A protein has these predicted regions:
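Serine-hydrolase catalytic core recognition
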Residues: 1-225
Length: 225
């Protein structure tokens, strides 16, 4: 169904900078009720990736959209999805900001995870295919060694794909162990990414950390979109 929220200052900022915003409801977003939940049972993120990709393909077909400049941003489960999309569909999602995400469901609390995923013992294959750490090799951003030195006066090239990851070390919902394991896997694979840590930050940044998060994210979008 069609739903929208009242305009706010953030929406206005995107509009003034020529960035189109859309919000996507995947099949388990709530509007499909029990049927939607059944679709994702024991395989979190799998069908959701397909749904987001369908939206990206539609966006890329529009004459006023630059098909190589599709970004995605999310926090918590949205952070998980952002990372998954840039690793599983970097041809459709080129830039992303993933905040406070779960990158291995074995490290999230049981009352949420097992409701949707069953236990790791009963569903090892489901945990594997839903684990962001499994798809690091699909993320294409690597280091370019022939860049010009900034002193040359030339602009540094803008990467065709870039993921930014953030997490608060005080997050008592999604423990930052998730992000530490994720960035370690990216480093082992020689991948290039942005990372911002918020000391003692909770599951959602507040005060000066919230201001920093907002401003840093805006700078990211201005650079890449």
């Amino acid at each position: 169904r069609d739903r929208w929220t009242a305009p706010n200052a953030s929406n206005q900022w995107y509009s003034e900078n020529g960035i189109i915003q859309i919000t996507v409801d995947p099949r388990a977003g709530g509007h499909n009720g029990r049927e939607g939940l059944d679709m994702i049972y024991r395989q979190l993120t799998v069908n959701e990736v397909q749904d987001f990709c369908a939206w990206a393909e539609w966006l890329q077909s529009l004459p006023y959209v630059r098909p190589e400049k599709i970004g995605v941003e999310g926090f918590s489960f949205g952070g998980t999805m952002t990372a998954m999309l840039l690793m599983k569909a970097p041809d459709k999602f080129h830039y992303g900001i993933a905040g406070g995400g779960v990158y291995d469901w074995a490290f999230y609390d049981t009352h949420y995870t097992e409701r949707y995923m069953d236990t790791p013992q009963n569903n090892p294959d489901g945990y594997k295919i839903s684990r962001a750490l499994e798809y690091v090799e699909g993320y294409p951003a690597t280091f370019i060694c022939n860049c010009l030195h900034p002193a040359s006066g030339a602009d540094m090239p803008v990467e065709p794909v870039m993921l930014k990851i953030t997490h608060g070390t005080g997050d008592d919902n999604v423990h930052h162990q998730n992000t530490l394991l994720f960035i370690d896997a990216l480093q082992k694979a020689g991948k290039k990414f942005d990372f911002m840590i918020y000391p003692d930050g909770m599951h959602g940044y507040r005060g000066y950390q919230g201001d920093h998060f907002l401003n840093a994210n805006r700078q990211f979008w201005l650079r890449y979109l």
